[in-house]
């Protein structure tokens, strides 16, 4: 199966993910990833689909995530860049130790958990993502009692491998996520 178009990827996501939050999280990550692809001169479609499908097996297989999806992606002949990115985004989760070795993988690792911070912040302050202030988001990153399940270390590891600092990354996500409805 070739890499699906956006509508096909969305249908695939919906066939495996029923939870509204997980679907919205996937959309947030996909949108941010497409923004990064354009910003860095890469393929926005590949990056969008990678972001959209990165947690496709989480709801069905939380204790082994992303093992199942990695198998599916290989069986479907998805690009190796996507497969590596999904594996690396699980760094330090379920005993995964693969670090990102591509810009796609680094961006996914940096973006995934940060989207959780953005989502939680928006629940507390219902403003559009594009109107959020980087200073406020960074303050919430430092507050480990806020969105306590978010693994902040992976955000920093992703930024390091992407070659950007946290300030730039937060500002990029404010810009990239600005198009999403709140």
Q: What do these predicted regions represent?
A:
Residues 1-61:
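Acidic/His-rich, divalent-metal-binding segments that scaffold phosphate/diphosphate chemistry
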Residues 39-144:
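Divalent metal-dependent catalytic cores for phosphoryl transfer on phosphate-bearing substrates
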Residues 4, 24-28, 64, 81, ...:
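Conserved active-site and cofactor/substrate-binding residues in soluble primary-metabolism enzymes
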Residues 75, 130-171:
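Divalent-cation-assisted or electrostatically stabilized phosphate/pyrophosphate-binding catalytic cores
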Residues 14, 34, 38, 74, ...:
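Short polybasic/polar patches that bind polyanions
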Residues 27, 31-39, 45, 154, ...:
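Active-site hotspot residues in diverse enzymes, especially metal/ion-binding acidic/histidine motifs
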């Amino acid at each position: 199966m070739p890499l699906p178009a956006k509508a096909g990827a969305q249908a695939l996501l919906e066939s495996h993910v029923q939870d509204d939050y997980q679907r919205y999280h996937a959309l947030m990550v996909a949108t941010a990833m497409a923004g990064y692809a354009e910003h860095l001169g890469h393929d926005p479609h590949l990056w969008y689909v990678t972001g959209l499908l990165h947690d496709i097996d989480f709801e069905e297989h939380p204790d082994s995530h992303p093992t199942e999806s990695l198998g599916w992606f290989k069986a479907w002949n998805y690009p190796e860049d996507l497969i590596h990115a999904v594996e690396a985004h699980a760094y330090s989760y379920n005993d995964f130790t693969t670090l990102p070795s591509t810009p796609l993988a680094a961006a996914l690792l940096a973006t995934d958990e940060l989207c959780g911070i953005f989502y939680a912040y928006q629940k507390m302050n219902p403003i559009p993502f594009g109107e959020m202030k980087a200073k406020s988001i960074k303050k919430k990153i430092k507050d480990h009692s806020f969105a306590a399940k978010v693994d902040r270390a992976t955000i920093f590891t992703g930024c390091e491998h992407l070659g950007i600092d946290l300030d730039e990354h937060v500002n990029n996500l404010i810009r990239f996520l600005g198009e999403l409805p709140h």
